[in-house]
């Protein structure tokens, strides 16, 4: 129920449970239907509601909600009006589309609840975004916000009194995971007790599933918020477990609550074309797991004679002639370089930047701030980062996950009531796998965008 089968090692591995051999204790997520679990086991299940002592804090909000959705999400998180029963809940899910300012809503909740807080993100560069947002939306002095890295953790464990000056902690999953691997998860339990937080917030809560569960098992925090634009996992097996873990957790679901206009400023182009791959080329894009998107990315930039021609149609008409800031997503770092070289050769005056793990952080920031055409991978820039004034996203990747498409189009933030943005997907119909992948996610697209234009 809470484990998945590892096809590589031919074994089942725990995903959302933890077993302590010394005490013979099995820990499972509190968000499950515990009465049903008790029925299955034929014995009582203890609901551990013992929480750490936390410090109250005073943080004043300096901004206001800019939409009815934001206002409702804040009420949901703090338990006001129609959501008053949430005031007694220890776990809440905030599921709203990218660009709807979940960050602001969470910061507003911190202010209203007056609890010392820890925010856990999945990437280091997002730490600064949260610190900047707290600085922007509240009166809190930046010196009261702690970037909880390994060095700071060691200081706190040596001298817990230093946490008194901090009101908010921001850290990454990797930081907690690496310290747990080094010292053990019980040591993490001590850390959370020492920092005296009453509220724990996960950003992009669908990303680090196993680590998030382990933190929950060993943190004993009064309240936890799970924020995401996609409360699901890409893997069918993992998503089945994921949904069980949050079955009993109240969920603010933007779409189900009727807020369906978050992407009505986006027109989608589905550009279907047939690159006429040979049997050998189709075979080369497969492995034992199925379709290989990295091999396909190599095929695009080396053998697909139509690929750059189609890309150029959009870049010439919208990026060069109309001046749109543009993001092109491919699957590999080498493909990023190939795309940049192609456009640099035909548009020498166009500012083009590459954003991926091979680029240092200062250059990455410069690319986000300055370049008109950005080439990246979805793993590097598919989520979380904000690109100011972005008008066009061209997604060249082969992918099955609805989440990936949602995150990619989510880079296109609303720029004004009358300003349209454009999301393009290239669908090579010469590959049956790519046709099938698009068909799986097409139904969701029809509900999201203002319109979908099919190009054949």
For each predicted feature, which ranges?
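Conserved interdomain linker/interface between the two RecA-like ATPase lobes of SF2 helicase motors
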Residues: 251-326
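Conserved two-lobed SF2 helicase motor
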Residues: 163-182, 368-383
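Conserved helix-turn-beta segment of the N-terminal RecA-like "Helicase ATP-binding" lobe
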Residues: 125-152, 346-350
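Post-DEXD/H (motif II) to motif III coupling segment of the RecA-like Helicase ATP-binding lobe
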Residues: 199, 204-265, 445
